[in-house]
Amino acid sequence: TNSEGSTRLMDFLDEQRMCRLYEKFILEYYRREFPQITANAAQIPWQLDDGIGMMLPVMQSDIMLTYKEKILIIDAKYYSHTTQTQYGTKKLHSGNLYQIFTYVKNKEYELADCPHEVSGMLLYAKTDEEIIPNNQYFMSGNKISVRTLDLDCDFTEIAAQLNRIAEEHFDL
């Protein structure tokens, strides 16, 4: 029926708005609370051998944190499910992992001529699911983390979680 369709569309639009709000909250938090870190939502250029990239999508990061020679690219994810089931086993969303890996490797290549360390993080809003991804992987010389941010707590605890990410990554 129309009412069911409207509800589904509204739920979808609300989820899109929440996702964007989640991304902006994290970005603005780091801008305000860590002025020594450059926090932006930078585009990452494709590193093409032939220079032909007309049909390639723009690589737009949600959050890119830079401090000295370290860069952390954060892809903020606000989903109702932080994992997907594949053959009866909980797995990370493969598209998300491919995306952050692509961002990191292209940024790494862009900075090849200067000292740098590029890492990536998928930062999911924590859900009530039993399995909560909090892992770290080393892929082709880069650290890729998957973390959750618990939003169902006092703001001081949310701030502490975000602070830990910056402090651990940038040795602050």
Predicted regions and their residues:
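Catalytic core segments in nucleotide and nucleic-acid processing enzymes
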Residues: 15-172
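Interdomain/boundary linker segments immediately adjacent to catalytic/signaling cores
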Residues: 1-19
